[in-house]
């Protein structure tokens, strides 16, 4: 083949590739966004009597409320409690969406959060989520997106088990025992020791300086 023939073949290949690679003018890449916790679908302030049941895909917000009765959260439901008092147990069932419990207290009520999909925040040690008073046990089990339990007064025992993506238990005053098992990674205390009236056991929580 002569040089001119080679050049024509090369030009033809380049033209074909150009036709294949040309994208339409409307081509765009869709943005990827994280799934956010739902906004409040029900907000209660002031006094309320009776058990509260939060359904899936609903978010209950208690803001400066006095709730006389238990609070139960179904799978895919969410709960935010700020500046409130709950007389009764607070129970979040496996598959719930998220929990914030800040500057609040329970009266004769345990707090149990199992199998949460989103973050769990029960006190933060700063003004973003101030100290809570919990008149009962705290159970945090199999939550998937991180757990923070910090600077709280807890009248019962604390159990943290099988939580994923970071567990912080920091600066709490716990009247009962502190038990930690199968959390991944093992819990940290953020450099602030917990005061524990009962026994300490499991993972890093067994150490007296934790």
What does each model-identified segment do?
Residues 4-18:
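Bacterial N-terminal signal peptides that target proteins for export
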Residues 18-26, 51-53, 57, 72, ...:
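Hydrophobic alpha-helical membrane segments, chiefly transmembrane helices and signal peptide h-regions
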Residues 55, 63, 68, 74, ...:
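Feature marks extracellular polysaccharide-active and adherence modules
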Residues 1-3, 11, 23-43:
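C-terminal region of N-terminal signal peptides and the immediate post-cleavage residues
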Residues 36-82, 207-210:
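N-terminal segments that cap or nucleate solenoid repeat domains
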Residues 37-51, 122-125, 133, 144-210:
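Predominantly polar beta-repeat domains that present long G/T/S/D/N-rich surfaces used to bind, process
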């Amino acid at each position: 083949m002569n040089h001119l023939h080679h050049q024509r073949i090369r030009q033809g290949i380049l033209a074909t590739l150009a036709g294949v690679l040309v994208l339409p003018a409307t081509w765009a890449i869709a943005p990827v966004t994280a799934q956010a916790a739902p906004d409040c679908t029900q907000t209660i302030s002031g006094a309320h009597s009776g058990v509260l049941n939060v359904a899936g895909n609903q978010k209950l917000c208690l803001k400066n409320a006095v709730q006389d009765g238990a609070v139960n959260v179904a799978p895919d439901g969410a709960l935010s409690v700020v500046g409130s008092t709950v007389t009764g147990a607070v129970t979040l069932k496996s598959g719930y969406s998220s929990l914030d419990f800040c500057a609040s207290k329970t009266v004769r009520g345990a707090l149990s959060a199992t199998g949460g999909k989103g973050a769990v925040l029960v006190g933060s040690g700063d003004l973003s989520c101030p100290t809570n008073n919990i008149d009962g046990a705290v159970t945090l089990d199999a939550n998937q997106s991180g757990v923070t339990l910090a600077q709280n007064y807890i009248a019962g025992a604390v159990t943290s088990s099988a939580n994923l993506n970071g567990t912080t238990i920091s600066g709490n005053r716990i009247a009962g025992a502190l038990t930690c098992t199968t959390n991944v990674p093992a819990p940290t205390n953020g450099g602030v020791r917990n005061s524990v009236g009962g026994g300490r056991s499991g993972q890093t929580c067994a150490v007296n300086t934790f």
